[in-house]
């Protein structure tokens, strides 16, 4: 996979994002194209009804973004994606029905180089078409801005859960918190399986994704890690050696109930544009764990979490960020590294640190 720079996107959106829409349904091609056209920030420069048409168009002209149907007859979406990443590297947004059966294929696509995915627009999913259109355009713009040379094919092996049983009433005085936004699916798919062993401390993962997608991602990840992972409940008992995920819809704080460490989650309320649920989680971690708090920042597009990172550092905890050049979206990592005493590390280095932190 070679580097490719999207100059049109980097020039402050002076030019519209040249987009290729790929879907075997002419109706869905038209719906997606109309949504992008109406936004004004996109130029739908091509439509393809199958993989061969898509690859032919990519060979003849340059696109800033490709939206790609997961399920297509003949050459399916995953096969097309592999060809795109090898022959015509282009930021790709998978467009999926995201059914129970389809979620695995969708997450497989993220391993093969897709940046993110989006539900196919529908009048039956509980959101207005206008709201779905706005969300699609925002996600498409985020995908078009990625550092494509940071994308990679992830070869994952299935793993048996070998988590050892913990002693009853064991408490913990250390914590690991991970946070990421756009591009963090790929970071997590790389980092957590690389840990290879049960972490010594509890690990809390905050991802800027919807709860529905987070639950499906946790289920998908279970096949590739040798330890317990969960979607955190409203009052989650926290144990060493397990990983707990919270979504962008949640804010978490730590407390002790009858001597047991718990994570209390509630609907997220942003403090302001630059502070959100991750900051509240980090404030709480700094208060309860002090120098035994480890905060890891991964790929992401916004700077929420910086205030929390400062508090962890002030409490003598440790803050590390994924090296910006390895992030699909380096904005968050770069912002963290502007803080004194925050360090940069590769994903394998972060995996080792997280596994051994105590």
Q: Across the structure, where does each feature detected by a protein language model lie?
A:
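Conserved acid/base catalytic micro-environments in cytosolic active-site loops
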Residues: 2-20, 26-37, 52-53, 63, ...
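Conserved Asp/Asn-Gly motif in the active-site loop of CheY-like receiver
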Residues: 45-52
């Amino acid at each position: 996979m070679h580097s490719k720079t999207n100059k049109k996107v980097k020039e402050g959106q002076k030019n519209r994002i040249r987009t290729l829409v790929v879907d075997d349904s002419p109706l869905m091609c038209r719906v997606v194209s109309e949504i992008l056209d109406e936004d004004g920030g996109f130029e739908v420069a091509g439509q393809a009804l199958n993989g061969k048409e898509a690859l032919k168009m990519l060979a003849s002209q340059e696109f800033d973004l490709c939206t790609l149907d997961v399920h297509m007859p003949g050459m399916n979406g995953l096969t097309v994606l592999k060809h795109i990443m090898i022959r015509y590297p282009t930021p790709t947004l998978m467009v999926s029905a995201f059914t129970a059966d389809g979620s695995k294929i969708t997450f497989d696509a993220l391993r093969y180089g897709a940046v993110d995915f989006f539900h196919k627009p529908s009048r039956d999913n509980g959101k207005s078409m206008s709201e779905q259109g706005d969300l699609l355009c925002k996600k498409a713009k985020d995908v078009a801005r990625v550092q494509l040379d940071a994308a990679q094919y992830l070869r994952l092996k299935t793993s048996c859960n070998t988590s050892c049983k913990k002693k009853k009433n064991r408490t913990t005085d250390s914590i690991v918190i991970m946070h990421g936004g756009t591009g963090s699916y790929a970071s997590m798919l790389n980092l957590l399986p690389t840990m290879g062993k049960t972490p010594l401390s509890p690990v809390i993962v905050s991802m800027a994704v919807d709860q529905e997608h987070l639950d499906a991602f946790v289920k998908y990840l279970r096949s590739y890690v040798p330890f317990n992972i969960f979607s955190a409940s409203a009052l989650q008992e926290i144990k060493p050696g397990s990983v707990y995920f919270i979504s962008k819809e949640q804010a978490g704080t730590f407390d002790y109930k009858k001597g047991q460490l718990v994570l209390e989650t509630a609907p997220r309320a942003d403090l302001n544009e630059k502070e959100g649920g991750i900051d509240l989680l980090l404030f709480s971690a700094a208060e309860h764990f002090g120098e035994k708090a480890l905060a890891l920042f991964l790929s992401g597009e916004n700077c929420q979490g910086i205030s929390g990172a400062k508090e962890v550092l002030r409490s003598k905890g440790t803050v590390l960020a994924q090296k910006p050049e390895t992030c699909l979206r380096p904005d968050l990592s770069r912002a963290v590294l502007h803080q004194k005493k925050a360090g940069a590390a590769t994903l394998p280095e972060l995996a080792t640190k997280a596994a051994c932190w105590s």
